[in-house]
């Protein structure tokens, strides 16, 4: 027994018809695609309204605005970030390394004040 049974033939025919309909549904009409209207932010609305009159000075003002935004985002902000990192993470922390003070003996002079350390008092009743 070779070939398809009547049930299998019917199923294959229905699948082919379904595929044909699906492919036909994928074709776009001339009105498609329908895109939603773009919502503009307040700055974009302002600049579109400002640039409707195409005078040269308006274009120059817009160019200066765009360049200032570029400088702010690509120069100033990175410099601030690098400065913050260098200030708080790379530089040595104050008092991070503690050095022992040198010993002071009688007769030594303290450099900051010029004070001379007096000789130690002798206590005859104590041995050392």
Curated annotation (Swiss-Prot):
InterPro entries: NADH_DH_b-subcmplx_su6 (IPR019174). Keywords: Acetylation, Electron transport, Membrane, Mitochondrion, Mitochondrion inner membrane, Respiratory chain, Transmembrane, Transmembrane helix, Transport. The chain crosses the membrane at residues 68-86. Pfam families: NDUF_B6. Disulfide bonds: none annotated. The modification N6-acetyllysine is found at residue 24. GO terms for biological process: mitochondrial ATP synthesis coupled electron transport; mitochondrial electron transport, NADH to ubiquinone. One of its GO terms (cellular component) is respiratory chain complex I. The modification N-acetylthreonine is found at residue 2. It is found in: Mitochondrion inner membrane. It is a single-pass membrane protein. PANTHER family: NADH DEHYDROGENASE [UBIQUINONE] 1 BETA SUBCOMPLEX SUBUNIT 6. Complex I is composed of 45 different subunits. Belongs to the complex I NDUFB6 subunit family. Accessory subunit of the mitochondrial membrane respiratory chain NADH dehydrogenase (Complex I), that is believed not to be involved in catalysis. Complex I functions in the transfer of electrons from NADH to the respiratory chain. The immediate electron acceptor for the enzyme is believed to be ubiquinone. This is NADH dehydrogenase [ubiquinone] 1 beta subcomplex subunit 6. The gene is NDUFB6.
